[in-house]
């Protein structure tokens, strides 16, 4: 924040003495810094105009302007007078006020942040990209002040914001590259300007992808939205990123994780209304199978399956030499099967239904072995049983004549079929569509509706579907069921909490407890529901506990509204026992 004092402007060692400048001025036959043939009077007037602006003595260009002025024969007296009269000491006044604030007890860091944030807001408000580009061009090289600025997080953040607002500014584009060259590319993920420069974009892409892959599922959820937004900035960035991930996905070590990230980015692009299906197919194995590529591309672009294209694929995948199964393992394509086969009220031409079922089952169950880009075996052992399970559940789910009571009679059949992952996903989608109907819970008489009971079975059989089950339960828990009275709403929410406790008991512990902790902190959930959850959880858990679980769950128990309000039978008090166990076995962080 400190500014240079007026009396310490010139450093003779660096800028040369006044005499040397005078010699240059006398040697007019030598190179003219201010331009060959330029009129001395005009140069003097231009320089005097600059000297008369406020605080010009603080400008980085002061020395160059002085040099031009003296070379044009300017008088030192005029310079001294103008610079002195127009010196208002804005920077020094800020420093003085900052010192006063610190002396009154304000933390120095807080003072610095206040000054910097105010300066940032002023720069963003008054930034002129044309002036910035002209100053940059005049410098002829990277200004020292710019290199100093990018060394600080505050000013890098300023450049990111300015670059977003002024993507065509050459000075900002160059600055973003400088920041990337300095090793800060991990910060640039949200800057669209970075997407215009291949060198910067490739660095940012590499750093961002490494960050996602190193952190597992939790890191994926945290960083994917920003990563996907950057990749989907334009067709060129999407193609470049997907091509790179397509190559990395072939690696034995970590290839499947990269493929997952690529598929999540495809989903993001689709949700934003972009049709990237042709790029997806071109980067896969579809290019070698033009008929299959055409059929897939047509359905993906329209967002719907159709009998003609399904028939093309069916013939190819029932032939003696079918295409690679990877061809139809496109998440967006499989989602279309979920809608066609499991959505209530969906209509499929009965003559073609077996083709739909066969292709979905084939994608879900067939295992291929490849060596040196050549397929050496196709294992179809589970194809028939998977097809049968999909068909059975499809007939149950899409039969509008079957009510809840009829479904109860078919529960054992449903439970058997749910053991197949693809069927479990279909049932989960079907349950979501069914219970999301506004009048669904109004018509239920059972304490635990059969559709919610199916979620328990899915949680038991399929760990990979735990996040989707919790997502559905949270959505239902937070929905305003205005058609039910207050007591019915409480009972429904207790039932949903019971499903969450079951999910917790099957291993999805931290996400469930984290959600309830947030409910308690936001104060938007009836406290009796939190007590119900705590009671049920204490009933199913036992030592040893992980530190992460204790740090999340213990504060819920110690909350004033929870502690001492849970009734227990006899001498057994699980709340007190849990708290005592934690305090004796863990170092608790407040």
UniProtKB/Swiss-Prot annotation:
InterPro entries given for it? TH1 (IPR006942)
A molecular function GO annotation: RNA binding
Q: Where is the composition biased (Acidic residues)?
A: 21-43
* Family membership: Belongs to the NELF-D family.
Any one annotated GO CC term: NELF complex
Q: Where is this region: Disordered?
A: 15-43
Cite a single GO BP annotation.
Answer: negative regulation of transcription elongation by RNA polymerase II
At the top level, the lineage of the source is: Eukaryota
Keyword match NADP: no
Give the protein name, as stated in the record.
Negative elongation factor D
Its function, per the record, reads: Essential component of the NELF complex, a complex that negatively regulates the elongation of transcription by RNA polymerase II. The NELF complex, which acts via an association with the DSIF complex and causes transcriptional pausing, is counteracted by the P-TEFb kinase complex.
Q: Which PANTHER family match?
A: NEGATIVE ELONGATION FACTOR C_D, NEGATIVE ELONGATION FACTOR D
Subcellular location(s) of the protein: Nucleus
Quaternary state and partners of this protein? The NELF complex is composed of NELFA, NELFB, NELFCD and NELFE; NELFA and NELFCD form a stable subcomplex that binds primarily through NELFCD to the N-terminus of NELFB. Binds RNA which may help to stabilize the NELF complex on nucleic acid. In vitro, the NELFA:NELFCD subcomplex binds to ssDNA and ssRNA in a sequence- and structure-dependent manner. Interacts with ARAF1. Interacts with PCF11. Interacts with NELFB. Interacts with KAT8.
Kindly state which keywords UniProt assigns to this record, in alphabetical order.
Answer: Nucleus, Repressor, RNA-binding, Transcription, Transcription regulation
Q: What coarse category fits the chief subcellular location reported for this protein?
A: nucleus
């Amino acid at each position: 924040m400190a500014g240079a004092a007026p009396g310490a402007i010139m450093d003779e060692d660096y800028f040369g003495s006044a005499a040397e400048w005078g010699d240059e001025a006398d040697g007019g036959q030598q190179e003219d810094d201010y331009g060959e043939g330029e009129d001395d009077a005009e140069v003097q007037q231009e320089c005097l105009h600059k000297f008369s602006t406020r605080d010009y003595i603080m400008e980085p260009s002061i020395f160059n302007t002085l040099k031009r002025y003296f070379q044009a024969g300017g008088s030192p007296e005029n310079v001294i007078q103008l610079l002195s009269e127009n010196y208002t000491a804005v920077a020094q006044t800020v420093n003085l006020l900052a010192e006063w604030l610190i002396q009154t007890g304000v933390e120095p860091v807080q003072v610095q942040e206040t000054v910097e944030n105010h300066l940032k807001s002023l720069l963003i408000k008054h930034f002129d990209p044309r002036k910035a580009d002209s100053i940059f061009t005049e410098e002829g090289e990277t200004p020292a002040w710019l290199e100093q600025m990018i060394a600080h997080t505050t000013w890098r953040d300023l450049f990111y914001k300015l670059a977003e607002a002024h993507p065509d500014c050459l000075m900002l584009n160059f600055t973003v590259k400088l920041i990337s060259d300095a090793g800060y590319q991990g910060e640039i993920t949200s800057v669209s300007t970075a997407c215009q420069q291949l060198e910067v974009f490739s660095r940012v892409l590499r750093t961002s992808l490494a960050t996602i892959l190193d952190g597992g599922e939790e890191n994926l959820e945290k960083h994917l939205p920003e990563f996907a937004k950057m990749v989907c900035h334009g067709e060129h960035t999407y193609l470049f990123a997907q091509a790179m991930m397509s190559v990395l996905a072939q690696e034995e070590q970590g290839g499947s994780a990269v493929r997952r990230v690529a598929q999540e980015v495809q989903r993001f692009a689709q949700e934003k209304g972009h049709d990237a299906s042709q790029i997806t197919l071109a980067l896969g194995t579809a290019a070698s199978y033009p008929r299959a590529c055409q059929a897939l591309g047509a359905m993906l672009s329209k967002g719907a399956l159709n009998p003609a294209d399904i028939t093309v694929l069916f013939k190819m995948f029932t032939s003696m030499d079918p295409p690679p199964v990877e061809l139809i393992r496109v998440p967006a394509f499989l989602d279309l099967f979920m809608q066609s086969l499991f959505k209530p009220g969906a209509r499929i031409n009965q003559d073609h239904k077996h083709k739909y079922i066969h292709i979905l089952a084939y994608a879900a169950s067939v295992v291929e072995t490849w060596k040196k880009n050549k397929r050496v075996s196709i294992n179809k052992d589970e194809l028939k049983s998977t097809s049968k399970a999909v068909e059975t559940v499809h007939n149950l789910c899409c039969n509008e004549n079957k009510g809840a009571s009829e479904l109860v009679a078919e529960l054992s059949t449903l439970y058997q079929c749910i053991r197949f992952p693809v069927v479990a996903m279909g049932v989960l989608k079907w349950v979501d569509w069914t219970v999301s109907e506004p009048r669904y819970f109004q018509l239920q008489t059972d304490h635990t509706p059969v559709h919610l009971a199916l979620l328990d079975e899915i949680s038991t059989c399929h760990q990979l579907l735990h996040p989707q089950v919790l997502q559905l339960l949270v959505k239902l828990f937070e929905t305003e069921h205005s058609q039910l009275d207050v007591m019915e709403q409480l009972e429904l929410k207790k039932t949903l909490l019971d499903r969450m406790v079951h999910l917790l008991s099957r291993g999805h512990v931290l996400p469930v407890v984290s959600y309830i902790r947030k409910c308690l902190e936001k104060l938007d959930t009836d406290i009796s529901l939190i007590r119900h959850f705590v009671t049920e959880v204490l009933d199913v858990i036992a030592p040893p506990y992980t530190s992460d679980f204790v740090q999340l769950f213990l504060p819920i128990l110690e909350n004033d509204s929870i502690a001492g309000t849970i009734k227990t039978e006899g001498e057994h008090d699980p709340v007190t026992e849990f708290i005592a166990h934690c305090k004796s076995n863990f170092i608790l962080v407040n």
